[in-house]
Amino acid sequence: LDIAREAAKAASTTRVEAEKALAQRVATQTAVTKQEGAEKELVKQAAAEKAAAEKELAQKVAAEKAAAAKLLAEETYHAIQDANSAAAELAKLRRAAAQSLTALDRAQARLTAAQSASEQAQAELVAAEEALSATDADKAAAAKEVEARRVAAKGAAAKVAAEKAATKRAETQCRAADASVAEKRAVCRAAQDRAAQLHAEALGGLPPLSSDQWDYAKARHLIVRAGFGGTPDEVQQLYEMGLHGAVDYMVKFHDHPVANIEFDPFRLERPEPWESRLEPDVERRALRDQRRNRERRQQAELRQWWLRRMAESPRPLQEKLTLFWHDHFSVQYQDLYRTYMLYQQNQLFRTYGCDNYGALLRGIVHDPAMIRYLDNHRNFKNNGNENLGREILELFSMGEGHGYTEQDLREAARALTGYNYDASAEQFVFLARRHDETEKTIFGRKGNWGGDELVTLILEQPATARYVASKLFVFLAHENPEPEVIDRLVHVIRAGNYDLQPMLKNLFLSQSFYSDRAMATHIKGPVELLVGVIRDLGLASVEYRAVDSAATQMGQMLFEPPNVAGWEENRAWITAERILARYNAVANLVDRPNTDIVGLLEGKGLRSSQEVVDYLIRTCLSAPPSDAKRLELVTFLGELPPPERWDAQRIELNARLRALVAAIFSMPEAQLG
């Protein structure tokens, strides 16, 4: 019984302790629950504060942009009105001066005639006085006539003097009007500078260059980097536009004509049904080889068509960025064997490459060439292929190892299941039954995401704007930019919802773009070099098949990048083998019978060998050579005949000048842009 009582007592004690433990656990759980509730409330409050802050920031940016835009409109309007009024006044004064000069010429002619008549009358008077047979009446008449002519001559002289004074006054007024126009143009430039400064500050962009720092060298830098180059006349025209006008001219190219250079590719030819009945197999192979040869020829024609567009298009920035995106979204023809697909992709880059990166990225996930190249036509639910999903994040949008996880890569691939193409039409198709419609978690967000939603999620990630801004800056300006420079470009890109034109304008107006780190520091790729020679010299009737072959020998065959990461840039272009190929390619391009260097020089007021060498250096180089190298070029050219004899010696002179240009382009400075 005692044992039972002890056991009961122990059980009671255990129960009490258990109840206490349970009560403590309940209390702890309650406290945890309260803490979780409080934390959730804090998270909710933080999210609300973040949303409010973002809203306030957006409103502030919008207000600043509106204020900057208003100030820009007011200052620019008044400055332009003043400049236009001054220009009209100057034109009026110049017309008056021209009329005065014409009247002066007529009066001068009358004075000359009167003086001649006076001299003749004087001679007649002397003759009359000396004539013994002359009567007094005749003498008086002759004297009267002479006096009348003297009076007329004196009146004509007075009139000429008055007209000279009027002309002098008109010239003074013209000079004053010129000064007024220059002053008002300076006011206009100052207003444009102020507006650009306010706009950059409102967007958080790069500080702009002052218009006073704009010169010919910077105009050439702009036309080389935002395009491929240009003749001295084209560079001079850009310089005379001023900084803001030149940048607008390059960036707002949709106002320019479209290059009238057509290419009409055919889709991949497929065997006809009757070919299967041919005997022996050698006949079928012969037909297959014929189709392959036609496809290869078409691919070569596509490369030559694009080279011609780059060299002749009135929209050089459009073609320059088409080349950039072609390298960024790399696809190899040898893995596709489909020219039509690559033509479509090239047009995609041309259409969206200067407009909106988001639209371009959406185009890529629907692009038949990219889908086939990265095997997304084999990416189905329950049987996935991660190639496109991986490269979309690693190479095309965010950069390797920035802002995503391996889980995000796998989920991105699932979002792209069913994104396919029709092999016959070579167009995008969505296979709904092959698409994975289950929930996916990408960047921590859950949903039944597809390819279009994937692009939206990518664009929301901070790493995306930074990656795009960095790659464009390095391509257009210089390598290894400072982080704060990229930060500012990121602000502009995100403020414009990935619209690239505001970012490009901010970059091309910026101090960073015209810094010593940027000017004449970029080693041109083979295509940039060859197209630049064509544009710098204004070459006509170019054999683009030879240009294509030369670019290939120099290491850059269009539509055949070495891998999905594209070509290695800058110093990778310069090897012992490739540098020799570069010299030979440029020499062969320049040294053709129809390359008329004399025509490039005519009408420029050049007479001496030194002047010709200096002009061609400005034509071909972004960075001047040393004095010693310049002297070598002058010695190489030798003495020149007078310009009036150039046409008669055109053939011989062109041969000498072509050799000189080839020598200039073989200099190390010619490899830089």
Name the predicted role of every residue range.
Residues 320, 345, 369-370, 615, ...:
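Surface-exposed interaction patches
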